[in-house]
Structure formats: structure tokens, C-alpha cells
Amino acid sequence: MTTGVRGDNAPDPSLLAQLTQNANSASAASTGKNGQVAGAKQENVDASFEDLLQDAQGTGGSKKATANQTSKSGKSEKAQASSGTSTTTSVAQASQTATAQAVHGARDSGFNSDGSATLPSPTGTEVNGVVLRKGMGTLALMGLIMTLLAQASAKSWSSSFQQQNQAIQNQVAMAPEIGNAIRTQANHQAQATELQAQQSLISGITNIVGFAVSVGGGILSASKSLGGLKSAAFTNETASATTSATSSLAKTATSALDDVAGTATAVGAKATSGAASAASSAATKLTQNMAESASKTLSQTASKSAGGLFGQALNTPSWSEKVSRGMNVVKTQGTRAAKFAGRALSSAMNISQMVHGLTAGIDGIVGGVIGAQVAQEQRMAGMAEARAEELKSLNSVQAQYASQAQQLQEQSQQSFNSALQTLQSISDSALQTTASMFN
């Protein structure tokens, strides 16, 4: 390259200074992410440099006087350009740091439609199982943050609720077992009562059967006793008839004796009527007086003894045998009467025992029926008690679930408030960061 005045290829110092300044400004503008724009600017700088060279060829000798000064100033400008280039390199390296990238990223993100700053997209795509999509807005990120906080709170609650749920499940599982135990106890009590009722019923039936047997035996004994009474009555009637016949015979004998005595007296009177001696008369009178005395005595005796069995027996022939037979009859009848009295007493005792057996039988049968009813009531009472215990257990479980739900609600409210506070803090921090970047 020549100047046109001197004909040499030495450059113009002023032009070199101008080009150096343009290069410095171009290198300063080329920092950051827009490398293509910086390259385009560099090309523009080169094009302007060539234009300046072409313009410099036409200037000629107007610049000849200042050539030495320009040469000196060009050397100083070269030194400054080298120092500017090193400064530009250090600035470019500083632009690659994380802080610079964050600042440029925030500047490049722009704003939302409502004027708030748009948060940068996260580098990861999943956090604790929650998928993060690119291009999510601020509200979506806040919702995800709240979800993550809720999940963290749920994990912290699960450890405390697991023990409570285990206890509740054990209580729910034990409720039917308690009910079954109460039902079993009630069934055993009812079975014991039923056995007692069956025993009482069997005892009652046995007593009734014994009463029937005793009644049958009593009827047979009474029949035999009535037969004995009829025999005794027949014997008594026979004795009365015999006494009447004996009395009639005694009267007949007395009448016969009187007739004989009268006939003898008449015969004696007729026989001695013709005797003349005083001895015969005296004997006849004596005989008559004796006959009259005997007749009176017999008549009086017969009339006095006609009303009793003993007098009649004495006035009858073989009265001692008759008296002996009468005593035997009395003895026999007395023995029979004693036996009958013993039988009557025994029958009375048997009747008392039979009545007692009948009462015990009725009591046993009624007790058996009532015992069966009591057993049924005991079984029903056991069922009701078992159901009541199960309902108590279920009520306790429901109360525990209600308490657990209340605790969960309170803790959820606390977690929600904590999440809101966290989001508020994040929002305030984002606003402060945005304000600091743009101010």
C-alpha cells in the first residue's frame, strides 16, 4: 500500500489510530452470546478500513507534514491497542461465568404479559417424581413447589399416622373376637341352664311316674281293705242272727219248763186228791211251792237275761263253748281292726308321699320349662352384650379416625400456610432480584 505522495508503503498514523478505536469498540460489542452480530460488526469495521485506505490514497501530500508525528502517535496507539485487546479478552472470559450467564439469561427471558419477570427454565426435568416441562410459567412452578411441599409434609405425617392406623386396625380386628368371646360365654351359660332345666324336667317326670305307681298301689290296697271290711260286716251280721236265734230258743225252753211244771202239779194234785193222809197233802203243797218258786225264778232270769248275749249264753246249753267262740271272734275282729288301722295309717303316709311326689313332679316340670326359657334369654342377652361391645369398639375407631382427620386438617393447614409463606418469600426474592437487575 502506498500513499501516493511519497510512493512508499508506510500506513497513515491517523488512520491507524482511527482503526484501532473502531476495533476496540467492535470487540467490546462482541461480548456475550451474540457472536454472529459481533462478527458482522467486525466485517463492517474491515470494510470501513478499506474505504479509509482508498480515501487516504487520494489525499496526497496534504498529510506529508504530519507524517512523523503520526508515526509517533501510531506507535503509542499500537501500545494502547494491545492493552485494549488484553482487556477485551479478560472481559470475554468474565462473561462466561455463572453470574454473568444468570444475568444475561434473566435479561434474555423478558417479561410475562402481566409485566412480571419470567423465571428461567430449569435444567432438570423431574424432581421427586414430578415432571417439569419447559416453558412453564411462574404460577405452574409455584404450584409444583406447593405440591412438593405437600408431598414432603405427607411423608412426615405418614410415619406418625402409620402407628395410629396400625392400632386402629388391631382394634377393628379385635372387635369381632371380643364379640365372639362374649357369645361363646353366653352360649355356655345357656347350655348349663338348659342342662339344669332338663335335669329338673326328668326329676319331675320321675316324681309323676312314682305318684302314678303309688296311686295304683293305693287303689289295690284300698280294694283289699274294702274286701276285709265287707267280710267283717258279714261276720257281724251272722253273729247278730245267731244271738237272736239263741234268745228265741231260750224263750221256748222256759215256756216248755213252765208247761211241764204246771202239768206235773196238776197231775200231783189229781194223784193226791184222793189221799186222805195229811202227809200226802203236805208233800203236795211242798212240791207245788217248789215248782212255783222254780218257775218264778226261771221266768225272772229269762226276762232279765233276754236283753244281753252273755245272759242268753248262760241260759243256753254249752254256753262255755259259745263264749269261747265269741271271744275268738272278738279277738279276730280286733286283730283285723288293728290291721286295718295300720293299713289306713300306712295309706295316709303313702298318700302324703304321693302328694309330695306329685308336687315335686309338677315343680320339676315347670322348672324345666322355665329353665329352657331362662337359657334362651341368657343366650339373647349374650348376643346383645357382644353386639354392644362391637359397637363400642367401632365407635372408638370412628372417634380415632375423626381425631386423626382433624390432626391431618390442622397439619395440612399449617403446611399450606408454610407453603404460601415460602412462595411469598420466593416471589419477594424474585422481585428484588429483578429490580436489582433492571435498576
From Swiss-Prot:
One Pfam family, short name: SseC
Chain intervals with Low complexity compositional bias: 79-102
Family: Belongs to the chlamydial CPn_0808/CT_579/TC_0868 family.
Source species taxonomy: Bacteria, Pseudomonadati, Chlamydiota, Chlamydiia, Chlamydiales
Entries under InterPro entries matching the protein: BipB-like_C
Name this polypeptide is given: Protein CT_579
Region (Disordered): 1-127
Species: Chlamydia trachomatis serovar D (strain ATCC VR-885 / DSM 19411 / UW-3/Cx)
Biased composition (Polar residues): 110-126
